Each structure stands twice: as C-alpha cells, then as structure tokens.
Amino acid sequence: MAFRIDILTLFPDMFNIFNHSIMGKALEKDIININTINIRDFTEDKHKKVDDYPYGGGAGMVMSLQPIVDSLKRVKESNRGKVIFLGPRGKTFSHEMAKELSKEEELIFLCGHYEGIDERCYDYIDLEISLGDFILTGGEMACIPIVDSICRLIPGVLGKNESFMEESFYEGLLEYPHYTRPENFKGKEVPKILLSGHHENIRKWRKSKSLKITKKRRPDLFKKYNLTKEDEKLLSSEE
C-alpha cells in the first residue's frame, strides 16, 4: 500500500514540484501518494474568503476556522493519519523526526498563511512543526522540504537503502566528501585512497572525514555522537 500524504493548502500548484525527479518516480510507482486539498473549496463564504480581520486588532489577516475544520473533516474520512501543522511555534524539524514520521502509513499536513490560523484550529491538530527560528511567507514553503525528507526514507523511494544510510545525519554525523571524474582538474586531484580499490581503507577514510567534518562544523552534533574506539583512532589519525 502506498504511503499516503494529504496536504491542505490555499496554493495546491506549489506542490507540483513533487511530480519531478525521485519523488515523481516514487509517485509513478505508487510507492507514495500525495494529494493536495484546496482549503478554499470548503469555505461557506459566498466570496470564497478564507481569512478575516483578527479580533482585538493588529496587522494582517487570520485564516478562518470554518474552512480549515471542514476540509480536515473531509480528509479524515479516508485518512486516519496525524494532522501536522507547519508553524513557527512548533517543534524544530530534524532527521530523527523524519525517521519517526516515515514509519507512519498516512499523514495530513495543514499549511497556514497570512498571520496564521484561528487558535481554535489547534484542537484539531496533533503536531506542530517548525523548520527553524525564521519566518516564511506560508506553510507551503516549510511543507515541501519536510514531506521530501520523510518520503525519501520510505523503502523503495531512493532504490537502495544505502543511498540514505550513508548520508548526513543518518548516523548522527555529517557526510564524507564525494568526488567524480575527472581524476585531476587543473591540479585539483581526487584523494589517492579513493582510487586504490581497497574497500576497508576507503571506509575508514570516509568515516574519518565524516567525524572530523562534524567535529569542526557541527560541534553540537558531535557532542551527541557516541564514539567507538575505532572512531577515536580515526580522529587522531593524520591524513
């Protein structure tokens, strides 16, 4: 059965990006199923309005409760997944969160816009996620990378599992450097060890690079990583 994702949004066309590349192939193979639902289709306002002025005054407009609730109710008739809202008050998204959500079978994403949503909408939301301490023009901008990050962990989307098992963050470290042809470009050479064909030495070189890059660039991640005796030797090795 395909992994199902329903996205409630005011701008369905923004998600056409999923029709391309790896995600597009996963959709064609029915590994994942991504549906967009236009919240505007559920408004009872004769002018198709989905927002209104905030009580108490203030700048901007607030997304109305009625079309959000009614669109959620319609989707939940066939999708029993968690309802996830993309907003700045949410828990910061991480690779660990992506792994946990990829274990689900169905998910529902709600994309906010304008100044936000009517606070009463939170009674219908299971989880709020933020991309970080910055503001975007709409939840769609946050939803796209989050959905992509989750879907690429679903078996079959990337092909071989090794494709993501060796990537940054999968084991809590940043990824090692990559090289391809030519072997020498204007004096910039590929490390000789990668041309040696010695798989164990290549593995150790990559792990060493991964450890050292993480320690230098993301000390916060490095502190959380449990070093093995081999890791300690690799960290102290000269290259």
UniProtKB/Swiss-Prot annotation:
Entry GO terms, CC = cytosol
The organism sits in which domain of life?
A: Bacteria
Stored SUPFAM superfamilies: alpha/beta knot
A Gene Ontology molecular function term of the record: tRNA (guanine(37)-N1)-methyltransferase activity
Q: Does the keyword Transferase apply?
A: yes
User: Pfam families this protein is in?
Assistant: tRNA_m1G_MT
Q: Which residues bind S-adenosyl-L-methionine?
A: G112, L131, G132, D133, F134, I135, L136
* Compartment(s) where it occurs, according to its Swiss-Prot or TrEMBL record: Cytoplasm
Indicate the enzyme's highest-level EC class: transferase
- What's this protein's function? Specifically methylates guanosine-37 in various tRNAs.
Report the family membership.
Answer: Belongs to the RNA methyltransferase TrmD family.
Q: What is this protein called?
A: tRNA (guanine-N(1)-)-methyltransferase
The organism is Clostridium tetani (strain Massachusetts / E88)
Gene from which the chain derives: trmD
